């Protein structure tokens, strides 16, 4: 399978004490982030330096049967171009957009068409038996942010991704907490309010994803515009209003937009407080497209987070993710190091 894009990039070179003990001189590891449109791959030194990254298309026809074959072929091609042998690869990590059981088994991955598959065993077999580890993509991205991103320097973080939906990942003692059924970190489906009209794709009602995702923010703005007569710059967009429109207007002081963002911040603050009282992370890392609103959004979330956690003076801080779309490949590579 031909490589569609290549890019050289130097990464950060610091590494935690635990990982240092696991490094092997001269060895490299590979991070693979499988998405519905493309598969992102990265070649890393074991100290976290990203040497090379590339992408291949995700071929989902015939139940996604070609995806791992394409990944293996592209890895072999890139290694051959750089005169690196598979024997020099410590292992590969695999981020998958769906629940992954502790043994790497995937019962179903709707986005890829996979059913009853163990992709880490399949990929290992395609790469001459090199070790392969796998995890849910959101959890893996959280691991990446802990290793070389917004959570670098901490061992216990929770990542919350605000995009089309709300995703998340929990890292405690540098390990992913995925749970027995692979559902750990499904932060978007934490119940935060009872609104009968607010049905989530999961089948539940009142999930934080329905409020704090990009689609949820736009929906809330449309609902407010229909229910209220408050003048607002958002009205020019009508039903085409986006989360970015709402956040930009809120930054400019638009009253209706600010009320929407306050609602978003309140329920995200409540969600983070619930998580803090459960796992007590050192840091919450906020990523995804909505997080591009920056410190403006973080400050609103933090206001409510502080309100809902009055019993604790020492609590996890809230900050922004730093790795963007590369978080998945960083985290997948970090899986290899244990």
What feature does the model see in each segment?
Residues 183-187:
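Structural signature of FAD isoalloxazine-binding scaffolds in flavoprotein oxidoreductases
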Residues 134-136:
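Short loop/edge segments at beta-strand edges and connector loops
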Residues 116-122, 188, 192:
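Short, acidic/small-residue loops that bind anionic groups at enzyme active sites
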Residues 105-115:
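A charged helix-plus-loop insertion that forms the helical arch/lid used to bind
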Residues 141-147, 168-170, 189-190:
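Adenylate-forming
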Residues 33, 91-97, 159-165, 169-171:
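Short beta-strand segments
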Residues 2-7, 11-91, 100-103, 121-132, ...:
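ATP-binding/phosphotransfer module of carbohydrate and carboxylate kinases, centering on a glycine-rich
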Residues 180:
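A short alpha->loop->secondary-structure connector
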């Amino acid at each position: 399978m031909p490589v569609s894009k290549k890019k050289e990039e130097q990464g950060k070179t610091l590494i935690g004490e635990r990982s240092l003990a696991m490094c092997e001189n001269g060895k490299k590891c590979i991070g693979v982030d499988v998405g519905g449109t493309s598969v992102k791959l990265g070649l890393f030194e074991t100290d976290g330096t990203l040497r090379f990254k590339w992408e291949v298309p995700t071929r989902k026809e015939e139940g996604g049967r070609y995806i791992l074959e394409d990944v293996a072929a592209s890895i072999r091609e890139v290694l051959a171009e750089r005169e690196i042998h598979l024997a020099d690869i410590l292992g590969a990590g695999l981020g998958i957009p769906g629940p992954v059981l502790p043994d790497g088994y995937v019962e179903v991955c709707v986005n890829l068409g996979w059913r009853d598959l163990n992709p880490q065993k399949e990929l290992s077999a395609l790469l001459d038996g090199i070790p392969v580890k796998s995890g849910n993509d959101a959890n893996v991205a959280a691991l990446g942010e802990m290793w070389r991103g917004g959570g670098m320097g901490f061992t216990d973080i929770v990542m919350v991704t605000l995009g089309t939906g709300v995703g998340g990942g929990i890292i405690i003692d540098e390990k992913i907490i995925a749970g027995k059924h692979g559902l750990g970190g499904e932060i978007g489906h934490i119940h935060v309010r009872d609104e009968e009209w607010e049905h989530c794709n999961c089948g539940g009602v009142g999930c934080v994803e329905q409020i704090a995702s990009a689609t949820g923010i736009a929906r809330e703005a449309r609902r407010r515009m229909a229910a209220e007569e408050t003048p607002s710059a958002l009205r020019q967009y009508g039903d085409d209003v986006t989360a970015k429109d709402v956040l930009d207007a809120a930054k400019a002081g638009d009253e209706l937009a600010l009320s929407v963002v306050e609602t978003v911040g309140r329920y995200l603050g409540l969600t983070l407080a619930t998580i803090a009282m459960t796992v007590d992370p050192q840091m919450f890392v906020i990523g995804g497209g909505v997080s591009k609103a920056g410190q403006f959004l973080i400050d609103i979330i933090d206001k409510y987070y502080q309100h809902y956690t009055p019993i604790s003076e020492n609590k996890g801080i809230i900050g922004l993710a730093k790795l963007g779309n590369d978080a998945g490949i960083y985290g997948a590579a970090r899986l290899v190091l244990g």
